[in-house]
A protein has these predicted regions:
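N-terminal targeting signals for Sec/Tat export/insertion, comprising classic cleavable signal peptides
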Residues: 31-61
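Acidic/polar helix N-cap motif
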Residues: 40-43, 76, 88
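Repetitive helical segments and hydrophobic/amphipathic motifs
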Residues: 14-17
Length: 130
């Protein structure tokens, strides 16, 4: 890379930094949340039905919901882990205000024995896009 081009790139980076352009790019990063839940064993089947309905609706009708995955710990089927990815913070906020999410919360509130929500900062996100 020649010195003239390097100088131009440096100027562009400096301008973006001073104008807040870099911060704006960071705010458009996907939002990734992880949730760890323990479900009452006696209510596990009902919980699975409720979460399946909620997750299906979320990915079907919310454009900002990029992915939601639920898995159980091997050997501990009532200990669930959720990996959720949203286009941005606004998409996450919209999801939490959706009718199907509020219904899920109301239906499952007494089924969940414990809940831990983990906010993350994406380091590297890779997938196979079609």
């Amino acid at each position: 890379m020649n010195a003239k081009r390097l100088t131009k790139l440096g100027g562009v980076f400096l301008a973006l930094t001073l104008s807040g352009g870099v911060a704006a790019e960071e705010s458009r990063m996907p939002v990734v949340r992880i949730a760890e839940l323990e479900i009452d064993p006696a209510q596990m089947d009902a919980y699975k039905a409720a979460v399946k309905e909620e997750m299906s609706a979320s990915v079907r009708v919310e454009p900002g919901v990029l992915a939601i995955y639920a898995v159980a710990e091997k050997g501990s089927p009532t200990r669930l882990r959720f990996f959720e990815m949203y286009a941005d913070e606004a998409a996450y906020d919209s999801h939490r205000e959706s009718t199907h999410f509020k219904k899920y919360v109301a239906i499952t509130k007494d089924m969940i024995k414990s809940r831990k929500l983990i906010e993350t900062v994406p380091v590297q996100l890779s997938d196979k896009r079609k």
